[in-house]
Amino acid sequence: MPKMKSKRAAKKRFSITASGKVKYKQMNKGHIMTKKSQKRVRRLKKSAILSEADSMKMRKQLLPYG
């Protein structure tokens, strides 16, 4: 049986915190910032926590053995 590997795309975009939650960067922050309000841009700077239902799926991709 070959070794199970974590999904590389998921590994680049998500990280697991010490408490076990899945953290990710907000989207829509790459370019075309002039259309977006300053309030929205400030909110998008912060990283977000994935919902509990989605984090279970993501943990299986990041840590296939765990």
UniProtKB/Swiss-Prot annotation:
Pfam families: Ribosomal_L35p. The keyword Ribosomal protein applies. GO terms for cellular component: cytosolic large ribosomal subunit. GO terms for molecular function: structural constituent of ribosome. Keywords: Ribonucleoprotein, Ribosomal protein. One of its GO terms (biological process) is translation. It comes from the Bacteria. This is Large ribosomal subunit protein bL35.
